[in-house]
Design a protein with these regions (language model features):
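Hydrophobic h-region of N-terminal signal peptides that target proteins for export
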Residues: 9-17
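Positively charged n-region of N-terminal signal peptides that target proteins for export
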Residues: 1-4
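A short, N-terminal "cap"/entry segment at the start of jelly-roll beta-barrel domains
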Residues: 18-58, 147-153
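Conserved short histidine dyad/triad with adjacent acidic residue
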Residues: 60-77, 105, 116
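Double-stranded beta-helix
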Residues: 24, 101, 123-153
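Short beta-strand His + acidic residue motifs that chelate non-heme Fe in jelly-roll/DSBH
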Residues: 72-74, 92-93, 114, 119-125
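Glycine- and acidic-residue-biased ligand/ion/polar-headgroup-sensing regions
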Residues: 67-70, 77-97
Length: 153
């Protein structure tokens, strides 16, 4: 009996000492940014850190790197959106009309969430990186259909 307990403890100690897998860890210099999808304005970069935002269900985590002055027109999502500002200043306003004078400014470390169907718009002040976490599929609905970049020729 003592041998069996010792063997279990030894196995547990070996597992605890094993190095953590590195394929689910992203250091800032190794984040795989690429172009944003067509439903957001060109010019920003996007990295999928976890999950698949286009899947029919499941969690996803993405990062969006935006240049200074980058704007996202008023839009809404059918599912909750959780946003953390990683760097820069992210400006967010609520409503159906983009109005920079009514936007709040959020520095790195800030967190906000938008409930389903909440109409909002955003802008980067300086190069800005935000991390977005939510439930798939990520749907992006513009208040004004003419603002949807994927519909422009």
């Amino acid at each position: 009996m003592k041998f069996a307990i010792l063997a279990v403890l030894l196995c547990a100690a070996m597992l605890a000492a094993s190095p953590a897998p590195v394929d689910n860890v992203f250091t800032p210099d190794k984040i795989p940014y690429g172009p944003v999808p067509a439903f957001v304005p060109a010019g920003a970069q996007l990295a999928v850190l976890e999950g698949d935002p286009t899947a029919s269900s499941g969690d996803f985590t993405i990062r969006i790197k935006m240049p200074d002055g980058y704007r996202i027109a008023p839009h809404w999502h059918p599912k909750r959106e959780n946003v953390t500002v990683v760097s820069g200043t992210f400006k967010v306003g609520m409503g159906d009309t983009f109005d920079e004078t009514k936007m709040g400014s959020f520095a790195a470390g800030s967190f906000a969430y938008m409930d389903p169907d909440m109409h909002h718009y955003a802008m980067a002040s300086g190069e800005t990186i935000v991390q977005v976490h939510g439930m798939s599929p990520l749907a992006f609905n513009y208040v004004n259909a003419n603002d949807d970049p994927s519909k422009k020729k």
